Amino acid sequence: NSSDLAFFAAEKAIKDSKINQESLNYIIVAHNFGDVKKVTKQIDQLPSLASRVKNKLGINNPDCICYDLIFGCPGWIEGVIQAQAFIKAGMATKCLVIGAETLSRTYDIYDRDSMIYSDGAGATIIEKKSKKINQGILSHKTCTFSSENTYDLFLGDSFNPKEYSKDRYIKMHGRKIYEFAITKVPQALKDCLESSKKSIHDVKKIFLHQANEKMDDAMVNRFYKLYDLPRPENIMPMSIGKLGNSSVATIPTLLDLVKNNKIKNQSLKKGDVILFGSVGAGMNVNAMTYQV
């Protein structure tokens, strides 16, 4: 289940960060379908996945607040943005943000789009640091386009006319989403970068939601075109060929791979300025500038 994968990712994040898990103020789990048991398509979100993760971790502190975030594929980035807001407001010093999904239990086997869907989870600790340290989130940008694009991604019937079950499956208007993404995401990245006061030449990596390699290529190319610049080599790490599209989990799992030098010619070092960007159901778009 998604909550199991979220727990495994959370354990690793807590271990890597060397924090005391009882000191966490918030656990935020971004997902879209909750836990979905085998042989059924029923979505289970009661209790929240965040509460289930807290229970599995064995955290006893009642002041560790848990909630789920339903925001489409950009959910993990939005969770990080919310965690930063809590810290800035003095409501938290440490937050655990997880993106987890089991799309293998929600897709239509008769839909060719389903072959790229996968399961996964990625977790991060967002922690308050000294203002003197020039690291962390520099800027962010979020938009929801719900006038004409609300139902570009939706739950619908199987493409198999002989499928008479009442189950609903992930469906999308693929071409419409593609055109939307390659327009809105590059602009969000640009707006976000300009808010950070960093130059386009400072950007070392761009981490995009792994929905479609062709679409991600187009988004990055258009982003650099906004600056009348060619796209730098190795600027965009990719994992979809290996891990598929796990929705909210694609960016945190991709970040983990690059951070641990698991992708050829892709690495990060202290001081690097990186961009995150995602697009998904809503339709939601967000971006974040971060300094390692």
Show the residue positions of the predicted features.
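Condensing-enzyme catalytic core mediating Claisen C-C bond formation in acyl metabolism
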Residues: N1, Y110-T183, Q187, V279, ...
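Conserved active-site "lid/cap" helical segment
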Residues: N1-N32, V36, D157-K204, M215-M219, ...
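Claisen-condensing/thiolase-fold acyl-transfer catalytic domains that form or cleave C-C bonds
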Residues: F7-A10, V36-I43, P47, D68-K88, ...
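Short acidic capping loops at alpha-helix termini that bridge into adjacent secondary structure
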Residues: N20-Y26, P62-I65, T93-K94, S199-K204, ...
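Short beta-strand segments
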Residues: A30, I70, C95-E101, I126, ...
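Glycine/charged-rich beta-loop-alpha catalytic/anionic-binding loops adjacent to active sites
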Residues: H31-G34, L57-L69, S104-D108, P230-M238
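Glycine-rich beta-alpha junction loops
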Residues: F33, T102, K129-S130, K141-S147, ...
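Flexible, glycine-rich active-site loops centered on histidine and acidic residues
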Residues: K88-A121
